[in-house]
Amino acid sequence: MASIEIPLHEIIRKLERMNQKKQAQRKRHKLNRKERGHKSPSEQRRSELWHARQVELSAINSDNSSDEGTTLCRFDTFGSKSDAICDRSDWCLDQ
């Protein structure tokens, strides 16, 4: 049996083409998932936090601050400061 001699540069070129093809497949797969609406876990968490803040803010805005005996409170939600209306019996910061 005769052995087949393949030049090294041919092998390297084939490996590079295989690698480029695999990268293109991954890129297409990622784009297709985005088009279908799939989100990565970090994107989902960011979205959930954003929606939670919007719900919280809309609940705060729906409560009128015209009630007597209320003051503006600051509390920590999801690592950021936000304002809320609370009774003076709660822990409040008068502003």
UniProtKB/Swiss-Prot annotation:
It comes from the Viruses. One of its GO terms (molecular function) is RNA binding. It is found in: Host nucleus. The keyword 4Fe-4S does not apply. Residues 16-49 are annotated as: Disordered. Residues 8-18 are annotated as: Homotetramerization. Its main location: host cell. One of its GO terms (cellular component) is host cell nucleus. InterPro entries: Cucumo_2B (IPR004946). Keywords: Coiled coil, Host nucleus, Host-virus interaction, Inhibition of host innate immune response by virus, RNA-binding, Suppressor of RNA silencing, Viral immunoevasion. Residues 23-37 have a biased composition (Basic residues). The keyword Secreted does not apply. It holds the Pfam family Cucumo_2B. Belongs to the cucumovirus/ilarvirus protein 2b family. Homodimer. Homotetramer (dimer of dimers). Acts as a suppressor of RNA-mediated gene silencing, also known as post-transcriptional gene silencing (PTGS), a mechanism of plant viral defense that limits the accumulation of viral RNAs. Forms a homodimer to measure siRNA duplex in a length-preference mode. Binds to both siRNA duplexes (19bp) and long siRNA duplexes (30bp). This is Suppressor of silencing 2b. It comes from Tomato aspermy virus. The lineage of its organism: Viruses, Riboviria, Orthornavirae, Kitrinoviricota, Alsuviricetes.
